[in-house]
A protein has these predicted regions:
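Membrane-proximal basic amphipathic "stem/tether" segments
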Residues: 1-58
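Active-site nucleotide/adenylate-binding loops and adjacent lid/helix of ATP-dependent enzymes
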Residues: 53-54, 63-170
């Protein structure tokens, strides 16, 4: 189903072009037309950036698209103090040694949004299910690149990974 949706989006993108496609996606999401000539809302500005800036800033977008590689960029810019503590980076979930992790942490797929697992207490966690789910997500992301979504406008050069970070709580 996921791959099928991506193929349909890609066909539509090729048929009507990037700018019209993005306007259609905006209309679908926000139920109104975007003002790309004079963007005022944050969402309009993001869509404007998708249309115009990614052609000129592709190397930077590539770097910042991945949750792990963006960390190096932030360090180079002197922003390391804003980064969450990183416990590990893994090519697949089978590499994770849960015994070496703190009691609470968050696992994230580096080239996605919403594919995160919050572990508040590892003593009550089902590690087999966690590994199975993470590997499924990685497979979907890495194989889905062949049928990448035109919403992104490019395919990240490297495979997605899993990162494990300190779990931060609101006060």
């Amino acid at each position: 189903m996921y791959i099928r949706k991506l193929v349909i989006k890609r066909m539509l993108y090729k048929a009507i072009g990037e700018k019209k496609y993005l306007k259609l996606m905006y209309l679908r999401l926000f139920k109104k037309r975007p003002n790309l000539d004079n963007p005022q809302k944050f969402s309009e500005k993001l869509f404007w950036l998708k249309v115009y800036n990614r052609k000129f800033l592709k190397p930077l977008i590539q770097l910042c698209y991945d949750k792990f590689t963006v960390r190096q960029y932030l360090k180079e810019k002197g922003c390391e103090k804003y980064l969450n503590e990183l416990y590990g980076v893994y090519d697949n979930a089978n590499e994770i040694d849960f015994n070496k992790l703190s009691n609470s942490f968050i696992l994230k797929i580096t080239q996605s949004w919403g594919l995160n697992m919050v572990i508040k207490n590892k003593n009550s966690a089902d590690f087999a299910l966690i590994k199975k789910t993470l590997n499924l997500w990685l497979n979907l992301i890495n194989k889905g690149k062949a049928q990448h979504s035109p919403d992104e406008g490019y395919v990240f050069n490297d495979d997605a990974k899993i990162i494990c970070e300190k779990l931060i709580y609101d006060k």
